[in-house]
């Protein structure tokens, strides 16, 4: 897995990285985030270990791309068939999941859909599948009940995420499938903050981490 490296990431002197791993949780960017790619981001962490971390940004749309257009580009449907897609598929946003492998699709979805040797169950309510088969199923109306598609992912090298958290770059909280799948993109950031117990208007760059 290729990981990103950002200049603002440094370990705070005298502090140790967080001991626990956060896969299956949400990362919520602090206002002081200096990397514009991650400003006001809500990221679902798919994997986190001593080797690094990988997550999907779940609240930023991909520029000038929707699900019907993507399905046509991938030759999953013909242009003429786009109007016949299930309504919820036609309105499904395509997200900017992160700067790593930004041409590759990743689908976070409910656990009612599974592809052997391709679907990763991250927690009880959220799975990850990154094959074209799930897009074919979604287009046919036989895919998961809930799903979001993202292009690319955010990655961290060993110890990098822990350092960012210690430096007050991120808050974190348990993931809520309803926030990920059923909340408007522009409402996810504030909802995630409130889930932590923080009123967005009161948050400052000097706030501590959860």
Curated annotation (Swiss-Prot):
InterPro entries: AlgH-like. GO terms for cellular component: cytosol. Belongs to the UPF0301 (AlgH) family. This is UPF0301 protein Mnod_6933. It comes from Methylobacterium nodulans (strain LMG 21967 / CNCM I-2342 / ORS 2060).
């Amino acid at each position: 897995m290729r990981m990103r490296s950002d200049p603002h990431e440094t370990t705070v002197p005298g502090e140790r990285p967080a001991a626990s791993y956060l896969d299956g949780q949400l990362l919520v960017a602090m206002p002081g985030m200096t990397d514009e790619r991650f400003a006001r981001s809500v990221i679902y962490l798919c994997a986190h270990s001593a080797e690094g971390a990988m997550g999907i940004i779940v609240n930023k749309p991909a520029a000038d791309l929707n699900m019907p257009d993507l399905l046509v580009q991938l030759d999953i449907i013909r242009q003429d068939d786009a109007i016949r897609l299930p309504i919820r598929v036609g309105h499904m946003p395509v997200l900017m999941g992160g700067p790593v492998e930004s041409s590759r699709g990743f689908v976070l979805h409910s656990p009612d859909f599974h592809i052997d040797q391709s679907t990763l169950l991250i927690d009880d309510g959220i799975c990850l599948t990154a094959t074209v088969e799930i897009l074919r199923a979604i287009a046919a109306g036989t895919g998961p009940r809930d799903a979001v598609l993202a292009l690319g992912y955010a990655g961290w090298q060993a110890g990098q995420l822990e350092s960012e958290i210690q430096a007050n770059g991120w808050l974190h909280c348990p993931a809520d499938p309803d926030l990920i799948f059923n909340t408007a993109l522009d409402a996810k950031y504030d909802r995630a903050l409130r889930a932590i117990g923080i009123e967005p208007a009161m948050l400052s760059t000097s706030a501590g981490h959860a």
